[in-house]
């Protein structure tokens, strides 16, 4: 079960989506339901700030977590 993230964490996710205009950084779709995705997973000690996040559309975000999509974190 996903734990509820602290306010500062949710704030950073919203900031990165705003900075990237809710545009997926993989497929370039603009989607109002875009997700703030961690480059280094939060559960693995990744920070909860915009330097460790990118915007993904729900489809690409799901594909990533299913292992169907690879993201080169050094590209960002």
Curated annotation (Swiss-Prot):
The HNH domain covers: 24-66
Organism field: Nostoc sp. (strain PCC 7120 / SAG 25.82 / UTEX 2576)
Q: Recall the GO molecular function terms of this protein's record.
A: endonuclease activity; nucleic acid binding; oxidoreductase activity; zinc ion binding
User: What EC number is given for this enzyme?
Assistant: 3.1.-.-
Supply the CDD domains for this chain.
HNHc
Q: Which gene encodes it?
A: adx
Q: Which family does it belong to?
A: Belongs to the HNH nuclease family.
EC main class here is: hydrolase
Which SMART domains does the record cross-reference, listed alphabetically? HNHc
tRNA processing is among the record's keywords: no
> What Pfam family is a match for this entry?
HNH
Name of this chain's protein: Anaredoxin
Q: Which UniProt keywords apply?
A: Hydrolase, Nuclease, Oxidoreductase
